[in-house]
Amino acid sequence: EWYTREEELDDLYYYAIRMGLEKQAQELGYEIFRIFNNDDWSLIQEADGIIALGKFSPKTIQDLESYGKPLIFVDSNTLYLGHSCVTTDLEDSVITALEYFLEQGHKEIGLLVGQEETADATPLQMDPRQRTFQQFLTEKGLYEERFVSVGQFSTESGYQMMEQLIQALGDDLPTAFFMASDALAVGALRSLQEHQIAVPDRVSL
């Protein structure tokens, strides 16, 4: 996995995926052993195959290829490299959520999103959720750059980003926010509660 053990605990998204993978593999009779980013990777030599969970740089992908094991990626689009992968249709999820907000009468919609890096600190391109959010609302004439905050995918970052938006926008705070992860939503909700901003009456998440 691209995370360390400590980092995974602050991102329930990847923790849930890993637990699901392990449960299904065990039900199928496979023995699973976990290797986190800061573990000894030489253990991979003992495996029959590799499930790589997370975001990886070209250099790290080459390192994984060098073991000569069957290799599949989860949450990384590696088809262009000739590797099988399982990914989420993030774009469709964003559009579905934004359409719901519009149906509920929201015209001012904000975004909290993380900027991901690979385990070896290689920056990734703009998050597809952020890109889709911007394109969709721009087409509707509703996109506001000041309603968008980019940080890390963690509860603490969600808290800090919402704190900054509350301070900067005051009464102009959007009536709805799309949260790019559960961890961000948890942190943002804590900030809103501390400021006694009613959810979902004043702000919907």
What are these regions (language model features)?
Residues 1-9:
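N-terminal helix-turn-helix/winged-helix DNA-binding helices
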Residues 2-3, 15-32, 49, 65-73, ...:
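Bacterial carbohydrate/catabolite-sensing allosteric modules
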Residues 12:
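Conserved catalytic/binding loops enriched for acidic/polar residues
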Residues 35-43:
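Short acidic low-complexity segments
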Residues 42-55:
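Short, well-ordered secondary-structure micro-motifs within conserved domains or adaptor modules
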Residues 55-56, 183:
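Alpha-helix/helix-capping structural signal
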Residues 58-60:
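Short, charged/polar "capping" segments at the starts of alpha-helices
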